[in-house]
């Protein structure tokens, strides 16, 4: 009975993230991070070079702790400027791996950003970015529990598919404000991908991100930074992240986030009565020094999955490798 309940919970998990349907097996759509505001390259290629110094970001997320097969995600990125004295070109590389039940996904993207200077003080820039990469999808058929041993829709052995992708983004920033938009999975057809063994395992859809934030000085020691992210795939509920951070002496960041699905317009293919609740998060970031940051976040799930798991944990580290380039004129808070 215990094993039956465990597999039932895993089945609910897979359904909730669109991994399984009644006929084909589908891939998880876009990876979730609570600390995306500290690594904009994960959602927008135009972010490459924003901090100007060569910057490395590492993060790991363990989602829905307590559920067998729940998502485990790691990412590593590096970005910076070329030696062009006008600081017009930013380059970046990001690699991500994600495991969810029988599915494993790995991707690598090379990012290029062209940065237009908009004022004499060089505090305002408009950046256009593009990324080229590929994603390797793997599905382990041995991890499925079949009620009918002769079910031909269950994959046999390991199924895999390599898919190229293009991303595009635009990013505008000042010392006190930023806004960005990006589109990912631009090469997808929206159709199921068929492997050599005729198993349909992947159905990626295009996603659009809109992000923004402001820096509000409260006193000499405190600043408030509210941010948002809207994620749209034109199929499921529109996903909205609302965040607020209190900066203490520019060293400690204490924040909270609320993530939910919203209905901006009527989507005819959207399941009626779908639970759009997602999570609330507590976030702590500490700058050990101006070039080294460490962060932790905890997500409390507000959906029906809350009865089956103990939340999600995410840790991140970033550090800057400052070379001979002149120091950045204004701090990079985004």
Model-derived regions: residue spans:
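Sec/Tat signal peptide C-region and signal peptidase I cleavage site
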Residues: 23-27
């Amino acid at each position: 009975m215990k094993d039956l309940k465990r597999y039932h919970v895993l089945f609910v998990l897979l359904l909730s993230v669109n991994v399984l349907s009644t006929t084909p097996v589908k891939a998880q759509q876009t990876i979730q991070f609570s600390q995306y505001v500290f690594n904009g390259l994960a959602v927008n290629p135009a972010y490459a070079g924003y901090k100007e110094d060569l910057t490395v970001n590492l993060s790991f997320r363990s989602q829905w702790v307590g559920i067998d097969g729940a998502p485990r995600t790691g990412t590593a990125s590096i970005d910076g400027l070329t030696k062009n004295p006008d600081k017009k070109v930013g380059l970046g590389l990001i690699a991500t791996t994600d495991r969810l039940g029988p599915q494993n996904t790995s991707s690598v993207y090379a990012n290029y950003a062209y940065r237009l200077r908009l004022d004499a003080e060089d505090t305002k820039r408009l950046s256009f970015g593009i990324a080229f990469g590929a994603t390797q999808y793997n599905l382990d058929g041995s991890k499925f529990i079949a009620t009918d041993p002769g079910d031909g829709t269950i994959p046999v052995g390991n199924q895999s598919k390599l898919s190229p992708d293009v991303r595009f983004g635009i990013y505008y920033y000042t010392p006190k404000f930023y806004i960005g938009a990006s589109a990912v999975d631009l090469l997808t057809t929206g159709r199921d991908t068929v492997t050599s063994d005729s198993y349909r395992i992947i159905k990626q859809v295009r996603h659009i991100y809109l992000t923004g934030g402001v820096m509000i000085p409260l006193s000499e020691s405190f600043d408030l930074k509210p941010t948002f992210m809207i994620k749209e795939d034109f199929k499921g509920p529109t996903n909205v992240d609302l965040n607020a951070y209190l900066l203490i002496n520019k060293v400690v960041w204490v924040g909270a986030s609320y993530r939910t699905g919203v209905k901006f317009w009527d989507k005819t293919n959207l399941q009626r009565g779908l639970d759009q609740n997602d999570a609330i998060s507590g976030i702590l970031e500490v700058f050990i020094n101006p070039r080294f940051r460490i962060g932790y976040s905890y997500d409390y799930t507000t959906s029906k999955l809350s009865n089956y798991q103990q939340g999600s944990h995410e840790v991140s580290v970033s550090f800057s490798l400052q070379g001979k380039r002149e120091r950045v004129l204004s701090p990079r808070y985004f």
